[in-house]
Amino acid sequence: MTTAALADTSNKTVTFAGAVYNIQELGDDSYTVLKAGIPVGRIVLSFGAANGVPEGDAISEDDLTLIGEAWFEAVG
């Protein structure tokens, strides 16, 4: 069973698997994902699909992609 990711655009966060990730804009459709102030990866919207790019092993590509899907759906 996959855990749902919940985006909060007013606080610029996504809650996923019991953790809160801050979302920081880098540019058009490109964001840094931070956990406790430490960058764990990036999310990018490319051709209508969310893509997660981990920076290290703190989070998987699949989990970042789920965070990205929730974020991009919320921001429209």
Task: Describe the function of each predicted region.
Residues 10-16:
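Short acidic-hydrophobic surface loop/beta-edge motif
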Residues 28, 32-53:
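Acidic, low-complexity, intrinsically disordered interaction modules
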